[in-house]
Amino acid sequence: MYTGRFAPSPTGLLHIGSLLTAVASYADARSNGGKWLVRMEDLDPPREMPGAASHILHTLEAFGFEWDGEVTYQSRRYALYEETLYRLKTAGLVYPCHCNRKDWQAGARRGTDGFVYNGRCRHPGQRPALQGKQPSWRIRVPDRDIGFSDGIVGSYTQNLARDIGDFVLFRADGYWAYQLAVVADDAEQGVTHIVRGQDLLVSTPRQIYLQQCLGVPTPQYAHLPLLTNAQGQKWSKQTLAPALDSNRREQLLRQVFRYLKLPEAPETDRPAELLDWAVAHWDMDKVPKHAITAP
């Protein structure tokens, strides 16, 4: 059975880009007779906004969304992540990293998603002294291409050794890394389809590699075009995207429908009816592949 999900982070409030992802993932799930889960990705407490998680859920309800089952909070799933990391340790796929980020990045080259780790701690004899600090844990990556067929973008491939380097699964500050948590959650929740923004396209080969290492299924992926401001910057919390205004629900939903190339919906003041229209007329093939300017 199709199982999709929407996974916001409570580092801020929902904005127009969040709404586009929510509508697309919801419409794709419901149009395929599937479930739509909501997962709160609250992995990084220092970056979270107090009250954002509950505000996000209330906003989703105000815009007519209905999810299946209970909301999942990553902050309550550490035991799952510990078990997942243990499996990778047992398989000899991960190692402790004692490197200071500033030091290893000083001589590192840039890859697809930031600096490529130089592999210093791969070899026990080369690891610097810890000096009482706990290490991070990295996974060894293969020197081969990992690719997939995206439902919107098409073919996408990375060589993890060349483009990314061994990446962190558990941070030295004691927090779980996104890549491990999202793979563990998707597998445990039986997620079969992931519809999300193209800012996460670059993370997908890492997640597929982790799925292969853990022997869990790889979902089908579709990465949505990003919404950008007049300066070409992605609308986000960092670029001060305004929070969704529940008093403008119909207007904002219709705006997102236009971005997703949905036909114009009939007049109604009920958000749930607008979402039903989106589900009935959903066509992934019509979704644009490239960024959309959203004033």
UniProtKB/Swiss-Prot annotation:
Enzyme class (EC, first level): ligase
UniProt xrefs under InterPro entries: Glu-Q_tRNA(Asp)_Synthase (IPR022380), Glu/Gln-tRNA-synth (IPR000924), Glu/Gln-tRNA-synth_Ib_cat-dom (IPR020058), GluQ/Sye (IPR049940), Rossmann-like_a/b/a_fold (IPR014729)
Function: Catalyzes the tRNA-independent activation of glutamate in presence of ATP and the subsequent transfer of glutamate onto a tRNA(Asp). Glutamate is transferred on the 2-amino-5-(4,5-dihydroxy-2-cyclopenten-1-yl) moiety of the queuosine in the wobble position of the QUC anticodon.
GO molecular function, one term: ATP binding
Record-annotated membrane-spanning stretches: none
Cited SUPFAM superfamilies: Nucleotidylyl transferase
Positions with a binding annotation for L-glutamate: 5-9, 41, 178, 196
Motif 'HIGH' region, chain ranges: 8-18
Residues that bind ATP: 237
Gene symbol of the encoding locus: gluQ
GO CC field: cytosol
A single GO BP: tRNA modification
Name of the featured protein: Glutamyl-Q tRNA(Asp) synthetase
Similarity comment: Belongs to the class-I aminoacyl-tRNA synthetase family. GluQ subfamily.
Binding site residues for Zn(2+): 97, 99, 117, 121
Protein species of origin: Neisseria gonorrhoeae (strain NCCP11945)
Enzyme Commission numbers on file: 6.1.1.-
Gene3D superfamilies: HUPs (3.40.50.620)
Motif 'KMSKS' region location, chain numbering: 234-238
Keyword Ligase: yes
The record's free-text note on cofactor binding: Binds 1 zinc ion per subunit.
Alphabetized UniProt keyword annotations: Aminoacyl-tRNA synthetase, ATP-binding, Ligase, Metal-binding, Nucleotide-binding, Zinc
Cofactor field: Zn(2+)
Superkingdom of origin: Bacteria
Keyword presence, Nucleotide-binding: yes
PANTHER family linked: GLUTAMATE--TRNA LIGASE (PTHR43311), GLUTAMYL-Q TRNA(ASP) SYNTHETASE (PTHR43311:SF1)
